[in-house]
Amino acid sequence: MTTDTLEKPRLSDTAQVDSQSIAPFPNSKKIYVQGSRPDIRVPMREINLSITPTEFGGEQNPPVRVYDTSGVYTDPNVKIDVRQGLPDVRSAWIAERGDTEVLQQKSSSFTQQRLHDASLDTLRFNHQRQPLKAKPRANVTQMHYARCGIITPEMEYIAIRENMSWQQAKEQGVLDQQHAGEHFGANIPDEITPEFVRSEVACGRAIIPANINHPELEPMIIGRNFLVKINGNIGNSAVTSSIEEEVAKLTWGTRWGADTIMDLSTGKNIHETREWIIRNSSVPIGTVPIYQALEKVDGVAEDLTWEIFRDTLIEQAEQGVDYFTIHAGVLLRYVPLTAKRVTGIVSRGGSIMAKWCLAHHRENFLYTHFEDICEIMKAYDVSFSLGDGLRPGSIADANDEAQFGELETLGELTKIAWKHDVQVMIEGPGHVPMHMIKENMDKQLRECGEAPFYTLGPLTTDIAPGYDHITSGIGAAMIGWYGCAMLCYVTPKEHLGLPNKDDVKEGIITYKIAAHAADLAKGHPGAQLRDNALSKARFEFRWEDQFNLGLDPDTARSYHDETLPKDSAKVAHFCSMCGPKFCSMKITQEVRDYAAEHGTDITPIAEDEVVRMIDVEAEMRKKSEEFREKGSEIYGKI
């Protein structure tokens, strides 16, 4: 037997979960909050905290619950096997609505072709489900149910998830101090109820991306009156990555807080890669279908047709993609407006459609067939992410006529989609200096009827290649505060190369910071509880609690250990920054102790005036006596 005749190992036999993605978070456990029925079990991560040291009062600190996107990967009671996919969450909910049917075969001709290609057997995900589709004349979107006055299990699940921090603060009655915030016209209630979720989806201010063919999904919501969400991008290219690497990026990204994942694969075996990703994803998956359609015509944009694109939409919808980026706003008349730009058209999808329009001198077929696309979307409950194909690629091009012209068209398309009860969010820039960001948010709300805004940053300056996660994180925090519903992460590799696992984590943590900062600035109920808990731990020198309450416990711990590696440093009442004699928090505590000992009341408001409260004359007499007792020598002997 020669090596040529040896059978390649099948991925369905060899694939393994990324071990780092299933490692438990320190001092944390997965908990589930049950809803009105046994199959509504909402996951959260509960961080257990240590007791406050006796010298600080000796009180028990209650655990802190945090929003958890990691799925069952961090549940030690669930056996993880990426070859089998994730447990089913939603199939019973979908079936009991009675408006779907099981297809006996895949509808896409491309899918059929791939299934009959024996050379792909080694790559195939073997446990494929038969696809669901809406029954004739039925509409299966969450928006349709919401407009019919129906509160779905998905909506109740989301209400429990979104309401977590507020409920926790209310129950504990501690650390519930929170600044009011400035919400710029958002309508954020004290309590998120299932009815509030329904009403926001019904009017189009929020979307629940939840394809009926993605039953593994843990429902989430995107909207300005909810917690700000973040998206992480993954995907192979013609030059790098494998299916296993992309699944590892997925599980790694959701571990650190990605609320959705976009698969932007442009390399080989896009169909098979996507199947593995969806079957192993507890978060919504988005794609840009024009990328795969372009691969089907060997990269020649002029050869694209509506028929090829339509088949691609159906292929991906039946796999379970939850939202599609569709660049239907790149109109023929807008393309010349980009000619004088510094960086022209930088969106890959936008440039593909611009080239097609110019080559045929015809209107964008995504625009002319938009209602046909809506028919497909509502048959599977795929949400629109209307793409900003003319977004600025440099701050010099920000807020120009091309960008805002497309945005106005996206507003028109939003209204068409809503006529079909199809869910919509709007994609936004890009590269925008800080003083021009709010104009983007205000115009989007006005033109698009408050449909959720989903932006890439924006990057606030162009001078920092290698640090664009920072340049964009600044803009992301600002636009999130102004009302943006979801922020698309940027990694340090932006403009330079494809991100690896470390880059994915750094991008996600950066954007979790931006999103949380926006929630704080908006005054989202309960958002400040985690900050308060960490601040209390910091003041009480509970180092392990500080690490564990942070977004990235591993990095915090490693930075601390670089200078204070011993276990004793984890209970020390100082850090490596100032040392034991200059720690401001230690000094403050000593001042409080002194005041308590001498009967002086120091309120939090008056702590900055503490020196005036202490009997200065008594202190001077005490020091004078100490000097005399030691022999009245200016320099003591050692």
Swiss-Prot record:
This is Phosphomethylpyrimidine synthase. GO terms for molecular function: 4 iron, 4 sulfur cluster binding; carbon-carbon lyase activity; zinc ion binding. The keyword Transferase does not apply. GO terms for cellular component: cytosol. PANTHER family: PHOSPHOMETHYLPYRIMIDINE SYNTHASE, CHLOROPLASTIC (PTHR30557:SF1), THIAMINE BIOSYNTHESIS PROTEIN THIC (PTHR30557). It holds the Pfam family ThiC_Rad_SAM. Keywords: 4Fe-4S, Iron, Iron-sulfur, Lyase, Metal-binding, S-adenosyl-L-methionine, Thiamine biosynthesis, Zinc.
